């Protein structure tokens, strides 16, 4: 296994259980030049995702009306059929965060046993809001409940789009107001923070403690082994 620090991955401070792999960051990449621009791309990932995006854009532009109707129907079906899944999954993330806080796993130190924080709690909170959700909270904290409310009461007798978070409150202003606030709190309260925290924790653990590349695929290494690369 090559030295993680040589690949731009911070070496753990103190004892850490590194994962032994011969993979080196960028070993499967293809380097090329397009005019004055140099490209360094991961061949399988770039080819599959690039072709998928091109095909999607082409079909959408070629059949705009049909695509618009199809995407609208798909959105309505997904949000109407799997609303329970969205709510349940977000609640599971919150419960998982609470479990990690009170369980022995919460004592695992990111960066190794002897690692020390680079920033104070005040600095971390400032970065979380300034670079994370700050502008979203300032803007959508006001506009989102208004948008939800308007989508329920704007049309004639109060019919709402079926995908709106408060579609069932059509024609009832008081209920639309309450559900609009509830949907906004769900989108910007503890639930999104819990989702971000679990994903960030997984990335940090496998990179800073296990010595793997800072990518989502590293999280699946215990399951798929070398096939994740």
Question: Residue spans of the language-model regions?
Answer:
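N-terminal alpha-helical transmembrane segments of multi-pass membrane transport
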Residues: 2-164, 171-176
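Helix-loop-helix module between adjacent transmembrane segments
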Residues: 17, 37-47, 52-61, 94-97, ...
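Alpha-helical transmembrane segments and their immediate juxtamembrane interface regions
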Residues: 165-170, 176, 190-193, 203
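Short membrane-interface loop/juxtamembrane segments of multi-pass integral membrane proteins
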Residues: 169-178, 224-228
